[in-house]
C-alpha cells in the first residue's frame, strides 16, 4: 500500500479497533488501554501512516509553516539561535510553530510527530543532543530537516555548527600558555554528539600531546547550582583551568571560586563555550568561545528554505567561524 494512500480507516481495520480509538491514540489521549495503544502504534508504523491535522483537500498544498524544536525556551543560547531563524523566516514569509521538549511526559518522537501532523513544510531541530527517537522520527518523513547547533552521529541530516575541535583546542592552548596545566572539560552531557565526537576527543588529544597530568572531564553540569557545587571538587583535585560548555553553569563555577577565596584568573581560569549575554554581564567578565548564534540560526533557516523548494545544497554541513574573546577570567599571556 502506498503510504500516501493510507487513511485512518486502514489503520483502524488493521488494528481491529474503531477510527475513534485510532484518533485517541494519535492525539495522545490516555483513555486507551496499553495493549490497544501498542497495537495501534504498531500498525501506524508498519503502514507509515501520517495523520493530517488539516483538511485532506489541503494535503497537497503548502502551509508556509516551519516547525522549530527547542529543548528549553528559557535558555539564552537557543533564544539567540531562534532570533536568526525567525528573521529569515519572516523574510521568506514563513510562519513558525515552536515546540519545546523540556519536561515533557510524552516522548520526543511524539512531539515531532505532532509538528508533522500539522503539515509543516520543514523542521529546524535545536538541541545539545539529537536523540535516537528524534533521528528515527525524521527518517520516517519526507519533510526537510536541518539541525542548528547540533549534529547527527553519521552526518545524515544537514547542519550548521562551528569547528568545535579547533575552538576548544585554541582555548586549551590559551590556558596552557597562561601556566595552567591541570585542566578540566566540563560538559552537560557526555553522550551529546558534539561532546562525544568533538569536544571530548579534542580535550583528550590535547592532554596527551602536551603530556599533562591530573586533567579530567566532568559530566552532567547543566545549571547554576551544578557549576557552583562543582568548584570544591575541582579545587581539591588541583584543577586550575576549565572550559565549560554552559554559560549559566560557568557563572555558578565563577561565583563558587570567588566565594571560596580563589583569585580569578590568577588561581583559576574559566573559559565558557556558549557566549550568550550572561558571559559579558558577570564580573570578572568571562573569556568565551564566541559562537555566532544569530548566524547559526539564520543560515539553518536559509538552508531549510532551499530544501523546502527542492533546491540542492552546495554544502550539507556548514561550519561558521568562531572567535575566542579574551576577557577577565583568563590571564591572556
Swiss-Prot record:
One Pfam family recorded for the sequence: Peripla_BP_3
Highest taxon listed in the record's lineage: Bacteria
Upper classification of the organism: Bacteria, Bacillati, Bacillota, Bacilli, Lactobacillales
PROSITE patterns named in the record: HTH_LACI_1, HTH_LACI_2
Molecular function terms from GO: DNA-binding transcription factor activity; transcription cis-regulatory region binding
Annotated region of DNA binding: 8-27
Protein name in UniProt: HTH-type transcriptional regulator pepR1
InterPro entries: HTH_LacI, LacI/GalR-like_sensor, Lambda_DNA-bd_dom_sf, Peripla_BP_I
Species of the source: Lactobacillus delbrueckii subsp. lactis
Protein task: Transcriptional regulator of the pepQ gene for prolidase.
Keywords: DNA-binding, Transcription, Transcription regulation
UniProt domain HTH lacI-type: residue ranges: 6-60
Amino acid at each position: 500500500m502506498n503510504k500516501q494512500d493510507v487513511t485512518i480507516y486502514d489503520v483502524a481495520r488493521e488494528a481491529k479497533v474503531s477510527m475513534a480509538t485510532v484518533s485517541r491514540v494519535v492525539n495522545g489521549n490516555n483513555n486507551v488501554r496499553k495493549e490497544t495503544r501498542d497495537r495501534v502504534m504498531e500498525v501506524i508504523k508498519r503502514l507509515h501512516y501520517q495523520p493530517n491535522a488539516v483538511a485532506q483537500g489541503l494535503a497537497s498544498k503548502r502551509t508556509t509553516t516551519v516547525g522549530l524544536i527547542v529543548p528549553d525556551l528559557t535558555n539564552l543560547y537557543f533564544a539567540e539561535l531562534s532570533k536568526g531563524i525567525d528573521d529569515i523566516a519572516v523574510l521568506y514569509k514563513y510562519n513558525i510553530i515552536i515546540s519545546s521538549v523540556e519536561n515533557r511526559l510524552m516522548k520526543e518522537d511524539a512531539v515531532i510527530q505532532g509538528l508533522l501532523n500539522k503539515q509543516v513544510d520543514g523542521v529546524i531541530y535545536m538541541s545539545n543532543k539529537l536523540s535516537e527517537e528524534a533521528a528515527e522520527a525524521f527518517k520516517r518523513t519526507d519533510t526537510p530537516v536541518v539541525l542548528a547547533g547540533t549534529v547527527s552521529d553519521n552526518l545524515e541530516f544537514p547542519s550548521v555548527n562551528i569547528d568545535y575541535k579547533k575552538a576548544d583546542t585554541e582555548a586549551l592552548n590559551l590556558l596552557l600558555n597562561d601556566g595552567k596545566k591541570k585542566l578540566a572539560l566540563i560538559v552537560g552531557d557526555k553522550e551529546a554528539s558534539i561532546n562525544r565526537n568533538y569536544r571530548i576527543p579534542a580535550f583528550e588529544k590535547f592532554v596527551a600531546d602536551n603530556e599533562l597530568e591530573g586533567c579530567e572531564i566532568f559530566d552532567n553540569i547543566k545549571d547554576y547550582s551544578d557549576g557552583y557545587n562543582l568548584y570544591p571538587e575541582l579545587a581539591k583535585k588541583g584543577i586550575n583551568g576549565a572550559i565549560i560548555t554552559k554559560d549559566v553553569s560557568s557563572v555558578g563555577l565563577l561565583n563558587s571560586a570567588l566565594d571560596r577565596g580563589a583569585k580569578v584568573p590568577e588561581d583559576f581560569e574559566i573559559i565558557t563555550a556558549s557566549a550568550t549575554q550572561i558571559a559579558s554581564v558577570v564580573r570578572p567578565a568571562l573569556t568565551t568561545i564566541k559562537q555566532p548564534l544569530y548566524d547559526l540560526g539564520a543560515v539553518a533557516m536559509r538552508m531549510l528554505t532551499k530544501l523546502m523548494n527542492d533546491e540542492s545544497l552546495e554544502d550539507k554541513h556548514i561550519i561558521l567561524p568562531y572567535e575566542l574573546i579574551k576577557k577577565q577570567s583568563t590571564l591572556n599571556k
